[in-house]
Curated annotation (Swiss-Prot):
The keyword Lyase applies. The record marks R139, K191 as: Positions MEP for the nucleophilic attack. The lineage of its organism: Bacteria, Pseudomonadati, Campylobacterota, Epsilonproteobacteria, Campylobacterales. Its EC number is 2.7.7.60, 4.6.1.12. Residues 212-372 are annotated as: 2-C-methyl-D-erythritol 2,4-cyclodiphosphate synthase. A divalent metal cation binds at D218, H220, H252. CDD domains: CDP-ME_synthetase, MECDP_synthase. It catalyses: 2-C-methyl-D-erythritol 4-phosphate + CTP + H(+) = 4-CDP-2-C-methyl-D-erythritol + diphosphate; 4-CDP-2-C-methyl-D-erythritol 2-phosphate = 2-C-methyl-D-erythritol 2,4-cyclic diphosphate + CMP. GO terms for biological process: isopentenyl diphosphate biosynthetic process, methylerythritol 4-phosphate pathway; terpenoid biosynthetic process. This is Bifunctional enzyme IspD/IspF. It comes from Campylobacter concisus (strain 13826). It comes from the Bacteria.
Amino acid sequence: MLDISLIMLGAGNSSRFELPVKKQWLRIGSDPLWLFATKNLSNFYTFKEIIVVSKECKYMSKFAPNYKFVDGGETRQDSLKNALELVSSEFVLVSDIARPCISSELFHKIIEAAAQADCVVPALKIADTAYLGENAIDREKVKLIQTPQLSRTTLLKKALSSGEIYTDDSSAMRAIGASVWHILGDEMARKITFKEDLVKISALKAPENELFVGSGFDVHEFEKGRPLVLCGEKIDYEFGLKAHSDGDVALHALTDAILGAAGLGDIGELFPDTDDKFKDISSIYLLQEAYKRVQSVGFVLTNADITIMAQKPKLSKLKSKMEANIAQALNLSQSRINVKATTTEGLGFVGRCEGIAVMASASLKFYNWTQI
């Protein structure tokens, strides 16, 4: 058995995907695409190391604590160089997380060809007429290069150290005189780049119909001379709430609930009160940015429930406006948002009119890419 490590490249921003969710976080069943693609390859072979390159290493490690995670670079090549620093095996197999349908047949053809060259590459032929600019070219000479690509580790490290930019491993290997062997690729191994490419994974399992629930709690004390804002609604009252931001304690609790349901930490981690750029910032903005983060990793909000505990001011007549503000900010139906207001019957710091406390809960489900 060959000594091989696996590198999965997944540090892209999905800028061409044009959906709120990054493609690496589309769910196949309950697994995100990057994990599904990695498990798929690891089912075919016992790798010395499995290394995933990402810009979300801390979050990804929750899903696969036995993998190694490496921060991505500015380019694919930078990302690969970062990952290669952890590789000590004789061979390294490099693939993209956006190729979830690599077959066992293709994989084993690559491994079996290892003795043929320093780098083994799957490539597709083209059936259509091809042009380069205004000139027709011989399509028999055109190859569409795919991954995974198998290389000798020492040679690939050398190839990438030159400073030249290459779009795949085989190009770098060829540039240093290493031998490259092409095998026939597989249509199912085509890369998902655009949302229209989702048809390529239409045979895979749709996202599980799971529900994820998070809770949030926050407290702010009253402060003279500040405006009072709750759920994005400015309220006529003699006190505002002491805070680094605009002090919207209700939205802070809701933001924590949404982040918690996705396992993404809390509002203080995303928007620390030690950062001056968040000074007096609108909590509507913070909520929207947090929700974008939640959407990017494959979730959508199904409903939210907020309980505001305030002895004063009276809020019952403002609840519908508060719900509408949240619904508009998150582009949801108001029927998905519920705001309640209560007192503590004169008990505690809320009862003494020293501040306001809020509890919130939120539920999320997976983004359903099969309905696009």
